[in-house]
């Protein structure tokens, strides 16, 4: 999701960047981007996880529920019952 956000942001910057009189597109874009923004910083922000995500994972991993497993989808994890167990059978076939 963060990657899509950055791609969309950079596309908007390229489209809406004001060009100075006789200037190049890069000079207009450089005026909109902070000086400390480097490719390394951008990649680090895309790869690293937020502190709240790490804390949430720690609490989820330490509190298991009976007959449930940890179901993770796109960095959001919840405890859910096993999908192949039907509740109406009560353990009988």
UniProtKB/Swiss-Prot annotation:
Tissue expression per record: Expressed by the venom duct.
Signal peptide segment: 1-18
GO cellular component, one term: extracellular region
GO MF annotation: an example: toxin activity
Annotated TM spans: none
Propeptide position ranges: 19-69, 79-93
Superkingdom of the source species: Eukaryota
Subcellular localization(s) per the UniProt record: Secreted
Record's keyword annotation contains Cytoplasm: no
Modified residues (D-tryptophan): 74
Keywords: D-amino acid, Disulfide bond, G-protein coupled receptor impairing toxin, Secreted, Signal, Toxin
Intrachain disulfide bonds: 72-77
Family note: Belongs to the conotoxin C superfamily. Consomatin family.
Extra remark beyond the main annotation: This peptide is an evolutionarily optimized stable analog of somatostatin. In addition, it adopts nearly identical conformations as in the somatostatin drug analog Octreotide. As this drug, it contains a D-Trp at the same position, whose synthesis is a common strategy used for enhancing the metabolic stability of compounds in drug design. Consomatins evolved by gene duplication of a 'Somatostatin and related peptides (SSRP)' gene expressed in the snail neuroendocrine system.
Role: Moderately activates human somatostatin receptors (SSTR) with a preferential activation of SSTR1 and SSTR4. In vivo, does not cause behavioral changes in mice within a few minutes of intracranial injection, but causes a progressive loss of movement thereafter. Four to five hours after injection, mice recover, even with the highest dose tested. Shows antinociception and antihyperalgesia activities in two mouse models of acute pain, most probably by acting outside the central nervous system.
Domain remark from Swiss-Prot or TrEMBL: The cysteine framework is C-C.
Protein name according to UniProt: Consomatin G2
